[in-house]
């Protein structure tokens, strides 16, 4: 039986706007950190990306390794339906260019995740699992297909609006457009998800459960979600 959760929850995280067309995942991690932790990462982003080994191509597993390496006190786990690189992505325009250089690193990181203390669960996360985590523990960093992510309150249907070409990851116009967002709240009775989109300046976006699920389970996302625990004092701020 599913637990009872609060009707309306929102975490008071600090918004961080992505600086480039590839750093949405890194920007989402920054939203989960306190001011001192954020500063330690943003002092020299280029050096950080080199030291962490992902350069300007960040996969969800890279974000997990970075959190574990830089902030071992932060509790999190990662759900995905694919352990490694899906060979089918070779035919996807979004992935074809980056697979050649990332394939070995990504597969190795999955293979060594246990000994590096990265908690990965190979399964699909249900909507209720996301809601329950946000209700009780923190936020979720979610990989979505931005082409399917429609916000109720943005000036246009797309959460990228008129700036889609400049703000979307890798700047490509394809059927799949990978983009990370932070699910930071929900309204249960209205069946709405509250999230922060690093492609925008400081604002909260809102969409329906159904649209959010379509965007996060689209082919290309591997249904990747990082469940991050936060300081409880940030809840409902």
Label for each model-derived stretch:
Residues 5-9, 39-42, 104-109, 155-162, ...:
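Generic detector of short, locally flexible boundary/turn motifs and exposed helical patches
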Residues 19, 58, 62, 125, ...:
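Short, well-structured alpha-helical interface segments that form or flank functional binding sites
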Residues 24, 41-42, 59, 126-127, ...:
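Helix N-cap and loop-to-helix transition residues
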Residues 1, 134-141, 145-237:
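Noncatalytic regulatory segments and standalone regulatory/sensor domains
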Residues 1-84, 132-136:
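Active-site nucleophile-adjacent alpha helix/oxyanion-hole segment immediately C-terminal to the catalytic cysteine
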Residues 43-46, 108-113, 143, 193-197:
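A generic short-segment signal for beta-strand/edge and adjacent turn/coil regions
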Residues 63-64, 68-175, 226:
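Predominantly the structural core of cysteine protease catalytic domains
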């Amino acid at each position: 039986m599913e637990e009872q959760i609060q009707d309306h929850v929102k975490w008071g995280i600090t918004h961080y706007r992505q600086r480039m067309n590839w750093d949405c995942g890194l920007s989402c991690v920054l939203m989960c950190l306190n001011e001192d932790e954020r500063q330690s990462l943003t002092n020299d982003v280029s050096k950080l990306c080199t030291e962490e080994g992902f350069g300007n191509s960040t996969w969800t597993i890279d974000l997990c390794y970075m959190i574990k390496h830089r902030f071992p006190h932060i509790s999190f786990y990662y759900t995905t339906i694919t352990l490694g690189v899906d060979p089918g992505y070779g035919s996807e325009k979004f992935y074809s260019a980056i697979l050649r250089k990332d394939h070995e690193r990504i597969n190795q990181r999955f293979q060594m995740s246990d000994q590096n203390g990265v908690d990965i669960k190979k399964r699909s996360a249900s909507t209720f699992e996301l809601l329950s985590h946000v209700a009780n523990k923190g936020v979720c960093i979610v990989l979505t297909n931005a082409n399917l992510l429609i916000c109720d309150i943005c000036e246009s249907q797309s959460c990228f609006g008129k700036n889609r070409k400049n703000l979307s990851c890798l700047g490509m116009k394809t059927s799949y457009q990978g983009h990370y967002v932070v699910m930071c709240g929900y309204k249960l009775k209205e069946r709405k998800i509250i999230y922060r989109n690093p492609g925008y300046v400081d604002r909260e976006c809102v969409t329906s459960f159904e649209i959010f699920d379509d965007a996060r389970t689209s082919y290309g996302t591997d249904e990747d979600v990082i469940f991050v625990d936060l300081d409880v004092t940030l809840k409902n701020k």
